Design a protein with these regions (language model features):
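Conserved acyl-donor/pantetheine-binding loop and adjacent beta-alpha core of acyl/acetyltransferases
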Residues: 36-104
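Conserved beta-strand-loop-alpha-helix junction that forms the acyl-donor binding cleft
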Residues: 103-112, 136-145, 162-165, 172-174
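Hydrophobic, well-ordered beta-alpha structural blocks that scaffold small-molecule cofactor pockets
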Residues: 83-90, 123, 127, 150
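Active-site rim helix/loop that mediates acceptor-substrate recognition in acyltransferases
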Residues: 2-25
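Conserved GNAT acetyl-CoA-binding A-motif
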Residues: 99-100, 127-140
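Conserved beta-hairpin
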Residues: 22-40
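Conserved acetyl-CoA-binding loop-helix of GNAT-fold acetyltransferases
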Residues: 104-107, 113-126
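Conserved active-site alpha-helix within GNAT-family acetyltransferase domains
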Residues: 118, 130-132, 141-158, 162
Length: 175
């Protein structure tokens, strides 16, 4: 339901961002840019207990938002069903520890097509190159594929399971 999605997105995005503030090593966010880039440097060590606790808290908070919005559990059920598309577990197949994973790249709609996403992507690529890292990311929007291909990303695979949603898994090898 588009109306439910519109109401839930700010809540779920806020919850995700709270989790990322706690668990991500590199973070770019700016009201001036009206854009956000969240990445995870997979070479960095982390406190597993803190990571799992933060992730559990975020999952519980997301679930509560979904149930509050739709007490029938229909939205919650669909969210659970789509779980395969809402994570980066596919990256385990890469067997690559020197990797930067792009979790979020978003630009406010009124600032799109002004080069903000390209500027943030250039910065992520620069960091990865300096550290000899592969970059991985996923997108659910087929229209984004052309943008990523401009940065030498290649399609690693496509996840498609229970419904029409596809997850495009992309990598950029260290060059």
């Amino acid at each position: 339901d588009p109306d439910v999605r519109k109401r839930l997105m700010p809540e779920l995005f806020h919850c995700d961002m709270d989790e990322f503030y706690e668990t991500c090593e590199i973070f770019a966010d700016s009201e001036e840019l009206n854009s956000v880039l969240v990445v995870s440097d997979e070479t960095e060590s982390y406190n597993l207990f803190h990571f799992l606790l933060t992730e559990a808290k975020a999952t519980l908070q997301n679930d509560l938002y979904l149930i509050k919005e739709d007490p029938s559990f229909h939205t919650f059920y669909n969210f659970i069903k789509g779980g395969d598309y809402l994570n980066s577990s596919w990256t385990q197949q890469l067997h690559q520890t020197k990797r930067l994973h792009i979790i979020y790249l978003a630009v406010h709609p009124r600032m799109q097509h002004h080069g903000m996403a390209a500027m943030l992507m250039d910065e992520a690529i620069r960091y990865a190159q300096e550290h000899g890292m592969m970059i991985s990311l996923e997108t659910h929007n087929e229209k984004n594929l052309e943008f990523y291909k401009k940065f030498q990303f290649k399609e690693y695979g496509i996840l498609k399971k229970n419904f029409n949603l596809k997850q495009y898994c992309l990598i950029r090898e260290y060059q």
